Amino acid sequence: MSSEAGLAKQYQRKTDKQHILDNPDTYIGSVENIDADMWIYDDDSQRIVQKNIHYIPGLYKLYDEGIVNSRDHVMRMIQSPILDKRFVSYINTTVQDDGTIIFSNDGNGIDIAKHPEYDIWIPELIFGHLRTSTNYDKNEKRIVGGKNGFGFKLALIWSTYGRIETLDHTRGLKYVQEFRNNLNVIEPPTITKVPKTSKPYTKVIFKPDYQRFGIPGLSKDMVGLLKKRAFDIAAVTDHSIKKVKIGFNEDLVPVKSFQHYVDMYVGSKTETKRIYESKDERWEYAIALAPNHEFTQVSFVNGICTFKGGKHVDYIMNQITRKLCDYIEKRKKVKVSPTSIKEQLMVFIRCDIENPAFDSQTKDYMNTPVAKFGSSCTVSDGFVEKVAKMGVMDVACSLTEAKENKAAKKTDGSKTKNVRGIANFIDANQSGTVNSKDCILILCEGLSALSGIVSGLSSEDRNTIGIYPLKGKLLNVRGEQIKKIADNKEITDIKKILGLETGCEYQNLGDVHKHLRYGK
C-alpha cells in the first residue's frame, strides 16, 4: 500500500449522515439489543410494570424524538403570540404490524413557504436537513424537549422510508413529501391548495431500518415500552388551555392527570398510600413507598423521560430528605441519615425546565444546574409531615437504631480475665474468673480520689476490688441516643470493665454473676 493510500485510509472525512449511521452511540444511543429492567405498559394488567426486557436504546430514541416533538407543539401553541393559532387537541401514535410508526397532531401546521435565504421549502428544511431548528435562539426561554437541530431527522436517517404531511391553514396549503434510503433520497414535495377553513395538522411516518438494528421488527416488549411513552405524554402534557387527547393505535390513553398516571404504577389510593403536591404549572411530584426498599425515580423534563434522573430529581429529593431528617430529629430525638429515608421512597416528578441540558443526545439524565432551571420549587412542610407519617419516620428510626446497635456492639465487653487499653484503670486480680461474683468495682471522681482509694487497700483487697476514675459527671444513658452512648469513652470503658453487652438484659444476680466481670 502506498503512503498516499495509507494516509487516505487513516484520515477520512464523512458526511453528517454517514457519521450518524457509523456512530449511533453519539446520536441515538446503542443499537445493540440489550437486557434491561424497564418500565413498560402491560396490556394484561393494564398497569405500568417494571420488567426485564430486550430492547434497543437507539430505536427507542427514534420513537421518542417523534412523540416529544408532538408534545413540544402543544407547548408552542400555548406560548405562541400569533393571533391565528389553533391549540393542539390530540396527539395520536400508531405502531403498525410491519413496524411503521406514525405520529399525528393538530394545532398549527408547519409554515409552507420557501426559506428566503436557503431557497428550500421549510418542511423539507426542518425534516430533511441536519442542524436546522426553531430552538437555536439562546436568549429565548423555552420549556420544550427539542434543542440541537437533530431531533426527528435522526429517525429519518435511521429509516428506509419516511413521509411528512402538514396543512398550513394560514396559507391554505397542504404539503406532502417522502424520504427514502436513510434520507439519501428526498422526493420533491407535493403542494396543493386547500380552503383556509381547513383544520391544520401535521403527520409524520417512518419505517425504521430494522436490518441496521439487526432485528426483523418490533417485539411485544418493545411495543409495550413505546406504548408506555404515550401514557407518559398524557401525564405530562399541559392541559391548562385545552384538554389534549392522547391516542395509541386508535385507543384513547386513559390518563387524565399526573396523579392518575402515578396510579398506573402503584395502584389506586386505596391500594397504596402516596403523597402528591403541585406548586405551580411547572412542578408536580408524588411520593410512594418503594416496592423493593430501593430508591426509585420516575421523572420527566419537558416531556422527556429522564429514566436515569438528574439535577431535577436531586433538587426535590434533597429537600425531602433534609426536611425529613429535621422533622424526625425534632419529633423522635433521633438523628437519621438521608440514605435511610431515600432508600424507602419512590418519587414521581414532572417539571418544565428552561432550555434544559442533558448529558447526551439520548437525554436520559438532565444536568442543568438548579440556578438555571428558570423556576424554583419549595417542598412544603405539610408534604414532608405526610410522608413521615406514611411509615417513613418509623422505618428510618428502626434502621438507624439497628445500625447504631451494630456499631455499639463493637464496644461490648465480655467476661475475660484481662482488660487492656483503659487508662488509669486498676483491675481486680480475680475479676473475670470464677470468683467474679465477689469482685467490686469502685467508680471514683478523678485521679486524686483514685490515689486515696489505692492507698487504703490491702494486698488482699486488690484481689477483689477494681477502681476506675471518672473525669466528672457520668453521662445519664436513660433515654439517650445509642450513638451518643457508643461515642462516650467512659461508658464504653465501663462496658469493657464490667463485660456488658449491648441489648443484653441482666434480670437477676444469677445473670450478673454468670456474665459480668464484677458482682457489685
How would you name each of these model-derived features?
Residues 20, 489-503:
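Short glycine-rich substrate-engagement loop in P-loop NTPases that contacts/grips substrate
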Residues 1-13, 17, 23, 31-52, ...:
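GHKL-family ATPase ATP-binding module
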Residues 16, 122-126, 490, 494:
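Activation loop
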Residues 119, 148, 487:
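Short, conserved glycine- and acidic-residue-centered signature motifs
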Residues 21, 112-132:
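Short conserved segment of the HATPase_c
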